[in-house]
């Protein structure tokens, strides 16, 4: 499996390799989307040199392009510019599509100020079903693995190639709970009313930021068997409580797989495709009006397969997130409590022994330990997240 982390990749490119059209997208049944951008130089990098530096962050969306999908049967579908709806350029062009004909080849034509670009016609590839999507933990000290098994392909004697996209949703909870706070107006401790209480739960979201691609070359029968898509450490907050994994599977051609593999080996990631020699990487897109080079590959899919899997926190061994260290104030005065409150600290414990000639002792915590919203969570529960009886 090809995995990695998203990092800024700076490459040195000759002038002939600059301002390249970058195409990300697939012709698909139902819905097709293309993300078009231009590679742009880092103006402040390598000053005084005749070569320019590029970064994955330095891309500019293609504006006012005309993007159409064509079939060799004469069919034609025009994509809309999503940026027109938002009022600013996005470089995203999309259109609704009928079910593709497996006997017809499809290609995309992109027209913009810099020229006309066309992809090679390809027949749509059928994606086999997902037989099982499951999680596995070898023992109580092991990470949690997300495993995939695909159904039988049309031709078990041929190697199958896939790409996967996934989305994650997970529940988080406060690492500390309190029912009290210090009221600055009355300069005393008070119990929280319901409207002041911190949320008991929150939900966070993520998706793959790396290219996930694989082949069945090392599997019998042209199908993936218990193929590891993801590895989650048992101390990761994602598996602290309830976790949901949504997977979209797409079968691709060998040529597209080789393109994805080249991206991986060059350190490319989604949203940025730059390398010292882009022209040496495989592509099925060319400029028909000039010798301008293109980065990207336009695949063609008859269908995609979706599956969902849950991880139940009670069925695995996991380590819950630890809160920050509490700050203890011995012989505390109300003015100290006011200062701590103004600094954003949260009152965790109040032990007032002054009536018995003992000091007031307070404990204070960091706000993110009490409020899941400060850890990037939403308090609006997604409809698909357990428990479902609420």
Where do the model's predicted regions map?
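A sequence/structural signal for flexible, mid-protein segments enriched
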Residues: 6-390
């Amino acid at each position: 499996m090809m995995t990695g982390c998203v990092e800024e990749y700076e490459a040195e490119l000759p002038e002939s390799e600059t301002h390249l059209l970058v195409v990300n997208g697939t012709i698909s049944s139902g819905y097709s989307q293309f993300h078009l951008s231009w590679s742009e130089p880092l103006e402040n990098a390598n000053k005084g040199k005749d070569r320019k530096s590029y970064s994955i962050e330095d891309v500019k969306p293609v504006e006012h392009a005309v993007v159409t999908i064509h079939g060799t049967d004469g069919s034609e579908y025009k994509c809309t510019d999503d940026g027109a709806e938002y009022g600013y350029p996005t470089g995203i062009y999309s259109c609704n599509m009928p079910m593709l004909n497996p006997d017809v080849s499809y290609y995309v034509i992109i027209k913009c100020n810099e020229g006309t670009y066309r992809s090679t016609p390809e027949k749509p590839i059928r994606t086999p079903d997902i037989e099982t999507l499951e999680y596995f933990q070898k023992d109580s000290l092991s990470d949690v693995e997300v495993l995939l098994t695909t159904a039988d392909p049309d031709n078990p004697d041929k190697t199958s190639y896939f790409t996967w996209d996934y989305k994650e949703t997970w529940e988080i909870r406060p690492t500390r709970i309190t029912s009290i706070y210090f009221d600055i107006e009355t300069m005393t401790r008070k119990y929280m009313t319901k409207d002041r209480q911190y949320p008991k739960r929150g939900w966070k979201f993520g998706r793959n930021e790396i290219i996930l691609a694989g082949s069945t070359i090392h599997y019998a029968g042209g199908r993936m068997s218990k193929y590891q898509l993801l590895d989650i450490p048992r101390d990761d907050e994602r598996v602290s409580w309830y976790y949901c994994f949504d997977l979209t599977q797409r079968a691709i051609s060998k040529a597209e797989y080789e393109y994805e593999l080249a991206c991986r080996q060059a350190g490319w990631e989604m949203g940025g495709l730059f390398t010292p020699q882009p022209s040496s990487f495989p592509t099925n897109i060319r400029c028909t009006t000039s010798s301008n080079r293109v980065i990207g590959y336009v695949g063609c899919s008859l269908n995609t397969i979706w599956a969902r899997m849950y991880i139940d926190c009670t069925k695995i061994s996991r380590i819950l997130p630890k809160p920050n260290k509490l700050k203890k104030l011995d012989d505390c005065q109300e003015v100290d409590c006011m200062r701590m409150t103004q600094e954003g600290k949260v009152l965790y414990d109040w032990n007032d022994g002054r009536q018995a000639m003992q000091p007031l002792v307070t404990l204070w915590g960091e706000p993110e330990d009490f409020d899941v919203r400060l850890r990037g969570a939403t308090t609006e529960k997604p409809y698909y997240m357990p428990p479902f009886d609420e």
